[in-house]
Amino acid sequence: VLVVGASSGIGAALARAVAAGGGQVAVSARRSDRLEELVAQMGTGYAVPGDATDPDDARRVADHAATALGGLDLMVYVAGFGVLQPLVETDPDTWTDVFRVNVVGANLAAAAALDHLGPDGIAAFVSSRTVDDANPMFATYSATKAALDQCIRVWRHEHPDRRFVRIVMGNTAPTEFADHMRPERLGEALEAWQGLGIPGGMMDVDDVGRALAEALAVALDHPGIDSSEIRFDARPD
């Protein structure tokens, strides 16, 4: 298993769960120190630092992971980036930065992994419930995840001999996803979302990591069953 975006949050939790279940895992992200800490914590695995948005890095990461693991059954793209900003305030650089991580990186990682995935291999991508919710001040994130969803559909048509899984993810904590967001802007956004009836419940990140590892293991073990979409959300209060 190759987890791209494994330095923290859902990616790190997924890698820990895979390792705890006896799976072989390679972890990738830009922060090499975090990857080394994760591998030491797991007591197994391979750290393969790299920038998923760079084509050469994406290819090198997939090649090194496949060599270390003896092939790839599964690549999971968990890396994600979002900003809280009204559309009227969003400049071209912000749009470019969010698209680069959430769409370009995901597609480069899939393309790089494709040569190493067997006929029943899986490329899985963490998408978002916000695609359906249209959260105010979160348009760049939800728009890029919608673009990713469309790419997943096209991957399926272009490579029907492989499997491409969309993982619809609800709110998860604790992660570092919102660390760069201003607290007052986050509070404003949460209030707006609540007013629109958008669910605000949170899932525990380690619970999500374990559940995702289990769901993907089932998909790998049963290739004849359609597992094209996996959905996780917090139970309503």
Where would I find each of the regions flagged by the language model?
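Conserved glycine-rich cofactor-binding loop
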Residues: 7-8
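Rossmann-fold cofactor-recognition segment
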Residues: 42-56
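Conserved NAD(P)H cofactor-binding loop of Rossmann-fold oxidoreductase domains
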Residues: 78-83
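Catalytic loop of short-chain dehydrogenase/reductase
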Residues: 122-147, 152-160, 171-173
